[in-house]
Amino acid sequence: MVVVVKVGREKEILLVDGGFKFLLGVNYWPRKLNIRMWRDWDEGAIREDISLMKSLGIRAVRFFIKDEDFADENVDIYPQALEKLRKFLDILYENSVAGFVSLIVGHMSGKNWRIPWTKFEDLYRSESIEKTMKFVERIVKEFKDHPAIAGWILSNEISLVKRGENREEALALLRVFSKTIKSIDKDHVVSSGDIPDSYLQETPNVKDYVDYVGPHLYLYDTDSIRHGYTYGAMLELFSNDGDIPVILEEFGFSTYQYSEDNHAKFVNEVLYTALAHNASGAFIWCFSDFIHESDPPYEWRPLEIGFGIVRKDGSLKPVAEVVKRFAKEVEEIEKLGIYTEFKRRPEVSVITPFYVFKDYEFVRYRNILGFWRSIQPVIIANILLSSAGIDNTVVYELDIEKTFNTKKLLVLPSTIVALSSTWRKMLNYVEKGGNLYVSFVKGLGEFRALHEAATHLWIELMGVENILEAGSPGIKYLGKTVIKFEKDLGFIGKGEEISIDIPVPVYTYRARPVDSEVIAVDNNNNPVLFKARRGRGYVYTMLLPIELIQSQIVVEYMDWSGKIQKIFRSIAKEVGIEIRYETPSPEIEIKPFYGKQSDIVIAINHGEHKKITITSTKQLKNITKIGGNAIVTSWTSTAIDIDMPKKSAVVLHVQYQL
């Protein structure tokens, strides 16, 4: 039999059948059976589901081996379970749907289900790992040649069953899993299937063991615009500047949480966001609602009954039409060569702090702040840049050297501390023609980084002297703070002011220039923005942690007036970063994919309904809409007018004069 798809890894994307195909997928339990799928097998019900999936354009299914239905305490696998799995894979094959198998389940939908051969507390112990790999080996050997198989996934959120006590304990399990799979099956991709703040999803640490990273993102935010942007920012974080392919392995909401209409708008926004941020696919949670509402865990987790794109009676929710339209459109976009003939060219990278993905003695910020708070400055910096029209990636601090030849600007946002070696590398990078923007923070609310120095190269790199009073926790900013520009900066003229509201106390450094220029001061005429020439490049030093201030840790709603974005656009202008396509509204995210004679441009409205104009530095020859639910109303040689409903997107093929 010919395989449904052959999925392989090439640098930052997964190749499907030798080319790029976006893996539009769903997570799956049967509508009529839910988690009882394997125990209460109903082939007719499953065929009905998969046939409907195919009609909607679904290309991939992530499904789950509920271990207690497959094996006993001695890891002896039930023959009838294997036959059911084979039949399920046959049904997928008949419908040309690719299967990604989650092997250790484990956790599912608000309940931890029994793993027969091990206690939860023993999951990472050698005896338990040996038994687990015996199970994995048996399943993989049995089905590695089945044409419906596309990939093997360790678990479903194993860290919710038992989190590794430390990074090495968790990675030991993943290493053995990867080695076991690859020793049997080198033809299919491998991933971990864990939660985003797990050790098993840390790209810098797992990239040698998995073929893609698959974050599970269920994000919440008072700011709907920031919420939409955050999905793309998280994909960039996990990509680590193209180190590894990324599939958005789980995302969604229950229509018992939100209306079906808003649910559909959300999925539309995220699908185009995933495509715009180089994701290799996106798997919606989940295919259908379930009819057995009193089954565990639905009895106490009613939201879990309603995540589907299909209702429990089999009728389609509005989101199903979104999925069907996206499936058709993405085929046309792929034919043009997105990701292969047309590629992004980001010239900026935002740096993730060293302590997020590696432990250092007495550096406890990841533990104190937690994963989500630790990454907020990075996420917001990515959002501010993207909403300023500046394409950018995210890169881990220990990997920054790989960006030195491809990025014109590196951004180190709201920095508590960076490695001494990082500062030295930055100096060398700038002297050779790169550019650096860095902002600092010493404290927020009750958090203080007291016994800390962000850098040792204040004068050598930034051209400033740190003049903070001995013993001070930092200069406090609270309430309305004005940034007054003493000199021109890109699009900002001397005398311009930008006000920022700071509702929570923020503590930072005070400095004076040594051989740098003071670009801006605060309300009290204290310098807050400096510019220093170092060799062939420039260093921009901001003493206000404006990225952290715009995070949901500090403010319920970001400032979407565009004035903060203007700072980044001005720096981008000064350092020669190309912004070929832009719009005045920061609520619109624009991601261009450049070709030799034309471009693909994806625009996503993360806000309310609006009419916008995208301007181009190129002379436009022809505009063709190839995707999305926004409407192109007119275009000229330099501008495109678009009517963009709330949470809508548009994909354009832009031909220009050569």
Predicted regions and their residues:
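Short, well-ordered secondary-structure micro-motifs within conserved domains or adaptor modules
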Residues: F404-I416
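A short helix->loop->beta-strand "cap" motif at the edges of active sites that frequently abuts
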Residues: V97, K186-H188, G242-I244, E431-N435, ...
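A conserved amphipathic helix/loop scaffold
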Residues: S414, A418-L658
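Aromatic-rich peripheral "rim/lid" segments of glycoside hydrolase catalytic domains that contact
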Residues: T132, F287-E347, Y360-E361
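Active-site mouth of glycoside hydrolases
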Residues: V2-V210
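Aromatic-Pro/Gly-enriched surface loop or interdomain linker
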Residues: E321-T406
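Active-site clefts of carbohydrate-active enzymes
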Residues: P30, F64, E157-G164, L217-Y218, ...
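Glycoside hydrolase catalytic-domain groove-lining segments
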Residues: H188-S259, D289, K328
